UniProtKB/Swiss-Prot annotation:
Localization per record: Microsome membrane; Endoplasmic reticulum membrane; Nucleus inner membrane; Nucleus outer membrane
Gene name tied to this protein: PTGS2
EC number: 1.14.99.1
Name recorded for this polypeptide: Prostaglandin G/H synthase 2
Membrane-topology annotation of the record: Peripheral membrane protein
Length: 604
């Protein structure tokens, strides 16, 4: 009888034991497979490593490791030696070879086809085929692990409000030393919300953006019904209205398109565009208006080239041209600015035609999370000689009409954005959004910062001080989390020490770049069967794509062709900045937020 009781107790203990894979024993992208209740096996297939935990490098891997520089070394080389890079940029075969390396080395870090999602931490047909999920770069922490980060850290994560108040919320605006401006900030927000579309009913693990990439649904609408309501059905164009001699989006009343506006907004100020949340701030509506004008302009060009084409073909071809323009602007202007490289990035799909590359993409929830760059936002917005706080700015399309696009572009080009890394720079006005980012990450059971660093070929941090580059915030984080291996991803990205004179820290760049470049170059228009003049209506349409830039987009669609870029016109304005947020000790209670964003804006 006693023997049976002991056997039963042993069985119960074994059944309740922690999943042996909770400690993430398999290294170098080896996959952990539990064997019974207390053992595991690492699958090291095609990792370049072998051994019980995939830690012993194969011969070729050893050579690669000896020759491969660290990410920070590569970044240093690319952001220094300007004279050398000027020569490289003017030698086509050298520039092409380096660009091929940049694209392949980054994009090969992204699993394609996708592997996991929030509910499947192992390979499954559901994780592959169900497009309503965001994919995952790393599987979620198993439900039966002893701590939220597996086996490291405390039994419970710290209160999200405490994390916000101690290390994330702004005491004083910290400008970006790279000179990033508000034209960039609103472009980022506008561009990414064609594929970051979390399903508000089902939760943060799900998306309504089933195209999972650059489809310009934020211009044309997510569904065919919405698209049809926004279309003019004449000459391929989108509906519009003329105000003071300039083209603006049509109204909700005219289109019967659902948009998110508070009830007090008058009908004439309720503009209707592809993304239902873009009425939130005039900066988003500015870009929505610019792209509306560009679509209708391209339709006019194609109509002149092809008078025989019907409305549908003019519309569809114009959409492909705008997709091409978008990708070129993102790579050659947007990513170029973010990188800080002296090497000149190049959008040329032909560079990958002889490489192993899959023309498909799936948006990862980690990519969505890391793109919450709310520190970019200033405390106030200056248009010409008028200053608006958040409360005056939100849902106020009348500002856009009153000032006009020219003043908006000129003003946002000159207004500096905030630094994203380094901590304590999230505006109080959007603290609810930052809090939601933390809580959504926990709901989706993200692994720790260090696990993501290893996944993207970076060395794990050994201390909080190494993460932040200072002592005060590091001590606060250690008190909150207890172990650097239990540090959460999202807060870590915002408190990580920035690279020298840069907007981001190492992890943000090394994680974000692979997702970004794979998503851009994995677009169908970049594939061999699409990338040819006939796809874009002939040489004229192909030329529009191949000559696109943020400056040409503005020149073609904004009166007076104001000079613009994604950085301040005078780089000296960004030089005198605080390097570390720990220097600011002002109390949060001394500052009062203007407004808390609500509803669908948690993703903005």
């Amino acid at each position: 009888m006693l023997a049976r009781a002991l056997l039963l107790c042993a069985a119960l203990a074994l059944g309740q034991a922690a999943n042996p894979c909770c400690s993430n024993p398999c290294q170098n992208r080896g996959e952990c497979l539990s064997v019974g209740f207390d053992r595991y096996k690492c699958d090291c297939t095609r990792t370049g490593y072998y051994g019980e935990n995939c830690t012993t490098p194969e011969f070729l891997t050893r050579i690669k490791l000896l020759l491969k520089p660290t990410p920070n070394t590569v970044h240093y080389i690319l952001t220094h030696f300007k004279g050398v890079w000027n020569i490289v940029n003017n030698i086509p075969f050298l520039r092409n070879a380096i660009m091929i390396y940049v694209l392949t080395s980054r994009s090969h870090l992204i699993d394609s086809p996708p592997t996991y999602n929030a509910h499947y931490g192992y390979k499954s047909w559901e994780a592959f085929s169900n497009l309503s999920y965001y994919t995952r770069a790393l599987p979620p922490v198993a439900d039966d692990c002893p701590t939220p980060m597996g086996v490291k850290g405390k039994k419970e994560l710290p209160d999200s409000n405490e994390v916000l108040e101690k290390v994330l919320l702004r005491r004083k605006f910290i400008p970006d030393p790279q000179g990033t401006n508000m034209m960039f900030a609103f472009f980022a927000q506008h561009f990414t919300h064609q594929f970051f579309k979390s399903d508000q009913k089902r939760g943060p693990a799900f998306t309504t953006g089933l195209a999972h990439g650059v489809d310009l649904s934020h211009i044309y609408g997510e569904t065919l019904d919405r698209q049809h309501k926004l279309r003019l059905f004449k000459d391929g164009k989108m509906k519009y209205q003329i105000i003071d001699g300039e083209m603006y989006p049509p109204t909700v009343k005219e289109t019967q398109v659902e948009m998110m506006y508070p009830p007090y907004i008058p009908e004439h100020a309720r503009f209707a565009v592809g993304q239902e949340v873009f009425g939130l701030v005039p900066g988003l509506m500015m870009y929505a208006t610019i792209w509306l004008r560009e679509h209708n302009r391209v339709c006019d060009v194609l109509k002149q080239e092809h008078p025989e084409w019907d409305d549908e073909r003019l519309f569809q071809t114009s959409r492909l041209i705008l997709i091409g323009e978008t990708i070129k602007i993102v790579i050659e202007d947007y990513v170029q600015h973010l990188s800080g490289y002296h090497f000149k990035l190049k959008f040329d799909p032909e560079l990958l035609f002889n490489q192993q590359f899959q023309y498909q993409n799936r948006i990862a929830s980690e990519f969505n999370t890391l793109y919450h760059w709310h520190p970019l936002l200033p405390d106030t917005f200056q248009i010409d000689d008028q200053v608006y706080n958040f409360q005056q700015f939100l849902y106020n399309n009348s500002i856009l009409v009153e000032h006009g696009l020219t003043q908006f572009v000129e003003s946002f080009t000159k207004q500096i954005a905030g630094r994203v890394a380094g901590g304590r720079n999230v505006p109080l006005a959007v603290q609810r959004v930052a809090k939601a980012s933390i809580e959504h990450s926990r709901k989706m059971k993200y692994q720790s910062l260090n696990e993501y660093r290893k996944r993207f070929l970076m060395k794990p941090y050994t201390s909080f001080e190494e993460l932040t580059g200072e002592k005060e915030m590091a001590a606060g984080l250690e008190a909150l989390y207890g172990d650097i291996d239990a540090m959460e991803l999202y807060p870590a990205l915002l408190v990580e020490k920035p690279r020298p004179d840069a907007i981001f820290g190492e992890t943000m760049v090394e994680m974000g770049a692979p997702f970004s470049l794979k998503g851009l170059m994995g677009n169908p228009i970049c594939s061999p069967h699409y990338w040819k003049p006939s796809t874009f209506g002939g040489e004229v349409g192909f030329q529009i794509v191949n000559t696109a830039s943020i400056q040409s987009l503005i020149c073609n669609n904004v009166k007076g062709c104001p000079v613009t870029a994604f950085n301040l016109p005078d780089p000296q304005l960004a030089k005198t900045v605080t390097i570390n947020a720990s220097a600011s000790h002002s109390r949060l209670e001394d500052l009062s937020p203007t407004v808390l964003l609500k509803g669908r804006s948690t993703e903005l």
